[in-house]
């Protein structure tokens, strides 16, 4: 019995450690995202209404407290660990090109469905990486280390969201909230069938010249 409880606790600790990678504004804005692990005594899943970037509750599937609305996708998965989150740097670029880039994880793309029960069967199968169009991603594996590896591979796309609309965007290009705001603006512009009008290389370079000392200092000290 003691050994079983230790195994269960280790599984939960592994889940918490993996989740720490995606508990940030770029991966899980707001209260979005949910994670789970299947252990010796059943399924443990993030409680509804808790944020991944804060200390969150992991509850047993039979707990009286409300589990995530998307518990179906976790229960239907054949894998031990399931992590669903909403990386703002991946959602805008979901396409067939990502299937080639992440082919070793047997990825697939699922067309948009309403979050919740409509997505309950999307985790069925051998796909360790699932792209949910206009929604997010699902990472699943029997190995905690492989889940961590997939998350790290996806995170390589974080630096690619660098749309410079105005001088302060360029200066604060590594600020998470600025990146989030720019991604939102970009999606809004594209959804309106408008063209992005960004700062060019010459304009960006000029921001670091003496007549932009204020921003040059910000750039140097941030």
Q: Which residues are covered by each model-predicted region?
A:
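Glycine-rich flexible loops
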Residues: 1-222
């Amino acid at each position: 019995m003691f050994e079983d409880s230790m195994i269960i606790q280790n599984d939960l600790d592994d889940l918490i450690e993996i989740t720490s990678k995606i508990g940030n504004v770029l991966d899980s804005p707001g209260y979005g995202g949910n994670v789970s692990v299947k252990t010796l005594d059943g399924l443990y899943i993030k409680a509804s209404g808790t944020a991944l970037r804060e200390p969150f509750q992991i509850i047993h599937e039979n707990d009286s407290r409300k589990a995530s609305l998307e518990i179906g996708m976790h229960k239907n998965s054949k894998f031990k660990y399931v992590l669903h989150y909403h990386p703002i740097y991946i959602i805008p670029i979901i396409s067939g090109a990502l299937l080639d880039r992440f082919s070793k994880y047997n990825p697939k793309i699922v067309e948009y469905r309403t979050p919740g029960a409509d997505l309950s069967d999307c985790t069925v199968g051998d796909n360790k990486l699932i792209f949910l169009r206009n929604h997010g991603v699902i990472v699943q594996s029997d190995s905690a280390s492989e889940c961590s590896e997939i998350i790290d591979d996806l995170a390589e796309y974080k630096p690619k969201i660098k749309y410079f609309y105005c001088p302060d965007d360029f200066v604060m290009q590594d600020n998470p909230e600025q990146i989030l705001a720019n991604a939102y603006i970009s999606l809004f512009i594209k959804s309106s069938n408008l063209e992005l009008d960004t700062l060019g290389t010459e304009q960006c370079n000029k921001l670091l010249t003496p007549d932009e000392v204020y921003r040059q200092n910000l750039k140097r000290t941030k």
